Amino acid sequence: MLLWPLRGWAARALRCFGPGSRGSPASGPGPRRVQRRAWPPDKEQEKEKKSVICVEGNIASGKTTCLEFFSNATDVEVLTEPVSKWRNVRGHNPLGLMYHDASRWGLTLQTYVQLTMLDRHTRPQVSSVRLMERSIHSARYIFVENLYRSGKMPEVDYVVLSEWFDWILRNMDVSVDLIVYLRTNPETCYQRLKKRCREEEKVIPLEYLEAIHHLHEEWLIKGSLFPMAAPVLVIEADHHMERMLELFEQNRDRILTPENRKHCP
């Protein structure tokens, strides 16, 4: 029932100004460079005073630990992934369904992920620094891409999601000022994942984590195929908790101070 009103709204949006409008030809699958709209001067000035930082990384790479570390910093707001929403959409659990049958439920989950992450990006920012767990960019470049490459998402589903993502980039402000990449060995993630024992994650194999790691490397290290959403600060995150907290402290200024972010490699 949830999809019917969305379909009607989507059809109207597409006719008016959505993907493929103005006679632009449809292109093949795959990420594309997207021309973003120019934002009003007052919005640009407001953005100059505020920063959005996304913490990216594999499943169980330490993102929650990173967010918790900086959550007590002055004038920092933290937005976690809306996992609780993905687990319960009017009584349904699309996250759990996707992990058990990605071919059937991949599009369902990723459509909702894109919507909820868009909500995260566009909600009013009350602090100077917003720290987000992942982003709408990694939803597209990592998780949608993995479903498609692994053969679990048909090309038509992939193209439709990509068209919506490109439209969002052109028409909505989902910009990011810095990406903190917690670079973690897939085997380390797998061991951590087994220890925390979340219900939906019990079926995740090591091969899945390896595929997700490979896509993060393509996007954030090699800079190949995918557009870079922001400068990237890489933190090696295979270490134990105490060492990770030390690394977060060492990188505090590079993460929270705008002038220092410009010098991130």
Curated annotation (Swiss-Prot):
GO CC, alphabetical: cytoplasm; mitochondrial matrix; mitochondrion
Localization of this protein: Mitochondrion
Transit peptide interval: 1-33
Tissue specificity of this protein: Predominantly expressed in liver, pancreas, muscle, and brain.
GO molecular function, one term: ATP binding
Enzyme Commission number, as recorded: 2.7.1.21, 2.7.1.74, 2.7.1.-
Protein residues bound to ATP: G57, N58, I59, A60, S61, G62, K63, T64, T65
Mutation effect (T108M): In MTDPS2; reduction of activity
Highest taxon above the source species: Eukaryota
Keywords: ATP-binding, Disease variant, DNA synthesis, Kinase, Mitochondrion, Nucleotide-binding, Primary mitochondrial disease, Progressive external ophthalmoplegia, Transferase, Transit peptide
Enzyme class: transferase
Span list, region Disordered: 20-47
Active-site residues (renumbered): E133
Reactions performed catalytically: thymidine + ATP = dTMP + ADP + H(+); 2'-deoxycytidine + ATP = dCMP + ADP + H(+); 2'-deoxyuridine + ATP = dUMP + ADP + H(+)
Matching InterPro entries: DCK/DGK (IPR002624), Deoxyribonucleoside_kinase (IPR050566), DNK_dom (IPR031314), P-loop_NTPase (IPR027417)
One of the protein's GO biological processes: thymidine metabolic process
UniProt biased composition (Low complexity): 20-32
Disease: Mitochondrial DNA depletion syndrome 2: A disorder due to mitochondrial dysfunction characterized by childhood onset of muscle weakness associated with depletion of mtDNA in skeletal muscle. There is wide clinical variability; some patients have onset in infancy and show a rapidly progressive course with early death due to respiratory failure, whereas others have later onset of a slowly progressive myopathy. Progressive external ophthalmoplegia with mitochondrial DNA deletions, autosomal recessive 3: A form of progressive external ophthalmoplegia, a mitochondrial myopathy characterized by progressive paralysis of the levator palpebrae, orbicularis oculi, and extraocular muscles. PEOB3 patients manifest adult-onset progressive external ophthalmoplegia and progressive proximal muscle weakness associated with muscle atrophy.
Protein role: Phosphorylates thymidine, deoxycytidine, and deoxyuridine in the mitochondrial matrix. In non-replicating cells, where cytosolic dNTP synthesis is down-regulated, mtDNA synthesis depends solely on TK2 and DGUOK. Widely used as target of antiviral and chemotherapeutic agents.
Family in the record: Belongs to the DCK/DGK family.
Summary of subunit composition and partner proteins: Monomer.
Protein name listed in UniProt: Thymidine kinase 2, mitochondrial
Organism of provenance: Homo sapiens (Human)
Lineage: Eukaryota, Metazoa, Chordata, Craniata, Vertebrata
